[in-house]
């Protein structure tokens, strides 16, 4: 157990879902961490950043494209503060270094999309599919979200094809059927 220096108890586990039904839980209790679409997009953008760090100016523009630069920066500062407050206890879920921000990668905070990508990177398609709850941020039509959603969907389909092929090669027909059904849920027109 991590102890919050302010005297409270830090959470044992924080789970954030960005794939499928968006939501969050702290120690198994549902919490409104992702109560707004912008908060969900912020967490997704930070956790999916290729090199980890994202320029603050870029985040501000992406999240508030219709606001002037000063207002967008102010809004981002408030949103980052809200994110930090919504997940209790140390360590902080975001790192800020001057003009850059990144997701801290704290082991107590599990993000489904990070678990999905990590499992694929480690050659574990079964674990990846276990983390894939559906489309990234359903209903969000930001260009970067749509592109990332398609990329993740394609990776999930490839993982399911590998699992189905391995099950077929091993004569595990029930597994083949299960993987094929899941594949068709994700990609109904897949052949």
Language model segments and positions:
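Long, low-complexity, charged/polar intrinsically disordered regions in eukaryotic proteins
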Residues: 9-17
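Short acidic, hydrophobic short linear motifs in intrinsically disordered regions
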Residues: 53-61
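Intrinsically disordered, charged and Pro/Gly-enriched terminal/linker segments
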Residues: 1, 5-9, 29-39, 45-52, ...
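Short, Lys/Arg-enriched N-terminal segment that forms or immediately precedes the first helix
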Residues: 18-31
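DNA major-groove recognition helices of helix-turn-helix
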Residues: 24, 39-46, 59-60, 76-90, ...
């Amino acid at each position: 157990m991590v102890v919050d220096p302010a005297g409270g108890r830090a959470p044992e586990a924080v789970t954030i879902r960005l794939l499928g039904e968006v939501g969050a839980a702290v120690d198994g209790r549902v919490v409104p961490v992702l109560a707004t679409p912008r908060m969900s997009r912020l967490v997704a953008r930070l956790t999916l950043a290729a090199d980890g760090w994202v320029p603050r100016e870029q985040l501000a523009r992406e999240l508030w494209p219709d606001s002037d630069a000063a207002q967008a920066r102010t809004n981002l500062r408030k949103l980052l503060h809200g994110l930090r407050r919504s997940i209790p206890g140390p360590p902080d879920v975001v790192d800020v270094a001057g003009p850059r921000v990144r997701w801290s990668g704290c082991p107590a905070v599990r993000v489904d999309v990070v678990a999905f990508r990590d499992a694929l990177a480690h050659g574990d398609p079964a674990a990846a599919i276990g983390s894939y709850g559906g489309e990234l941020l359903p209903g969000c039509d930001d260009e970067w979200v749509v592109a990332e959603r398609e990329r993740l969907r394609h990776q999930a389909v490839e993982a399911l094809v590998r699992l189905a092929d391995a099950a077929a090669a091993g004569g595990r027909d029930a597994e083949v059927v299960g993987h094929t059904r899941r594949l068709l849920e994700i990609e109904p027109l897949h052949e």
